[in-house]
Amino acid sequence: MVKVGVNGFGRIGRLVTRAAFNSGKVDVVAINDPFIDLHYMVYMFQYDSTHGKFHGTVKAENGKLVINGKAITIFQERDPANIKWGDAGAEYVVESTGVFTTMEKAGAHLKGGAKRVIISAPSADAPMFVMGVNHEKYDNSLKIVSNASCTTNCLAPLAKVIHDHFGIVEGLMTTVHAITATQKTVDGPSGKLWRDGRGAAQNIIPASTGAAKAVGKVIPELNGKLTGMAFRVPTPNVSVVDLTCRLEKAAKYDDIKKVVKQASEGPLKGILGYTEDQVVSCDFNSATHSSTFDAGAGIALNDHFVKLISWYDNEFGYSNRVVDLMVHMASKE
């Protein structure tokens, strides 16, 4: 089982750790966070406003974080180059601070003895992988990879199924996205992105997202055919993608439902879900799929122009894919 270090114990860092313990697929051996001391880590890991209390034991003992009886080494370094991952036995590092997202910055982890780095965010220059879409293209020569964004992980599996069966001529995506840590509780300064600085709980905020264009990186045939934007809305978690696209081959909406359902039960099982229930966002809290197609919410204008809806837990679904990507990478060692 691959031994993992986590850099940054924020929403994704903590949930990747939860996903690792829930699945038992990877072994978390070290965590680095300069801003959270050990006893605070115990508290933050145990209690979660969104996903509820951790079902297991967590305590501080002999300077280590002990989860379900397993002792985890704690570092508090600000500079990734100074983290002694090798000493703790960490082979792979999940870079989840949101700060070190380039090859150069994430590469600093390799200096401390890590063998590979998985950036839990989109990256300007690191190769991006989406489980179920292009993970097979990963090869051992790559030391630093990106797991793309939660939204790309929702959109890409759906886009792949649709494109493989009917061909996507072009498409626009909107994600109606839950609040994240980068937003403000009340109006405040936000650099050049003025709207992003408005109160998160009070507003629907139009925002940019690179998620749709990033699909073109993981599915090269769709490069230049998709773009999109986001609306940030006042919900704490769970987001939904609206993909409106023009199809090359004529398809009835029932045909689309059929192929998505088949994919959800076959090659994309566990990644792409399918539901015909009358669901709302809360129903996907703590869901582990990357994307769940909402058969009842989509509409077709005609046989070539459709609007497709897919839900995702932008925190926990994504965190589970980070774990899955590491398992896949380890299988290639």
From Swiss-Prot:
Annotated Gene Ontology cellular components are: cytoplasm; cytosol; GAIT complex; microtubule cytoskeleton; nucleus
Locus of motif [IL]-x-C-x-x-[DE] motif = 243-248
Free-text activity regulation comment from the record:
Glyceraldehyde-3-phosphate dehydrogenase activity is inhibited by fumarate, via the formation of S-(2-succinyl)cysteine residues.
Modification N6,N6-dimethyllysine, positions:
3, 64, 192, 213, 225, 258, 261, 332
User: What role is this protein assigned?
Assistant: Has both glyceraldehyde-3-phosphate dehydrogenase and nitrosylase activities, thereby playing a role in glycolysis and nuclear functions, respectively. Glyceraldehyde-3-phosphate dehydrogenase is a key enzyme in glycolysis that catalyzes the first step of the pathway by converting D-glyceraldehyde 3-phosphate (G3P) into 3-phospho-D-glyceroyl phosphate. Modulates the organization and assembly of the cytoskeleton. Facilitates the CHP1-dependent microtubule and membrane associations through its ability to stimulate the binding of CHP1 to microtubules.
The record's subunit annotation is:
Homotetramer. Interacts with TPPP; the interaction is direct. Interacts (when S-nitrosylated) with SIAH1; leading to nuclear translocation. Interacts with RILPL1/GOSPEL, leading to prevent the interaction between GAPDH and SIAH1 and prevent nuclear translocation. Interacts with CHP1; the interaction increases the binding of CHP1 with microtubules. Associates with microtubules. Interacts with EIF1AD, USP25, PRKCI and WARS1. Interacts with phosphorylated RPL13A; inhibited by oxidatively-modified low-densitity lipoprotein (LDL(ox)). Component of the GAIT complex.
Its recorded name reads Glyceraldehyde-3-phosphate dehydrogenase
The gene for this chain is: GAPDH
